Amino acid sequence: MRKKIDVILTLCEPYRNYGYSFRFDVSGDLDKDVNRILVLLSDALLEDFKSRAQGLTQKDDDKAVVYATGMRNGMTAQQRLDRHCSRLRYILEGWIAISFVLGWNKQQTKAKIMRYLNNPFGIPEWADALFDSRYMATILAEGDLNRRTGLMNSILASMSLVGEGVINDTYCYEAIRKMAEAGVERYGVRRGSDFPCNACDEVCLHTYPITQIVVPVHPRCVCQTFPVYSDD
């Protein structure tokens, strides 16, 4: 991610004179290049997550990973990463506009970005920019487009959560597949922690056919599965 952010900052250098008016779309070529770089970032993250997930499988096929990166609550892992990269785009655009107005050089801007990437709106100069109507960067002119959407402020944490979900889904898929190969027809779920979670508690109340996968209940779910036999 550092290298791709560095490339974006370099591409933006010729547009310093735009100052308050800076947006990625001040140039069609710049806009396309930034989008291309962020697509590459999203693809690279997904490949990394898939590679790590593949290490959890005992099979030569990739069914578990295909399942884990597939549709969940209306979005695939790729779509979730694309969404977070789109969020990163707007945040970078705002930071770069601020850096041009305040006269930061590229290294100062990069240092600020990396320092505050876990809390992108924690940069002290951000609050001042939000109340300055001269800025044209989308996120500064219109506010956070993801406010009240349930998404975390931290782009890094959001992307990491996608990876956790892929790995957790793969692990659970493999656990249930092993039971199926052993002839188990139904399984149950038990809590793997005492952290309060009504959704996990509800899932643990029932047993399920081996063809139905109900775990993980959420990306950081640590619930465990166990075989259920007819005489249990």
Please identify what each model-predicted range represents:
Residues I139-D232:
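Acidic, glycine-rich two-metal-ion catalytic cores of nucleic acid-processing enzymes
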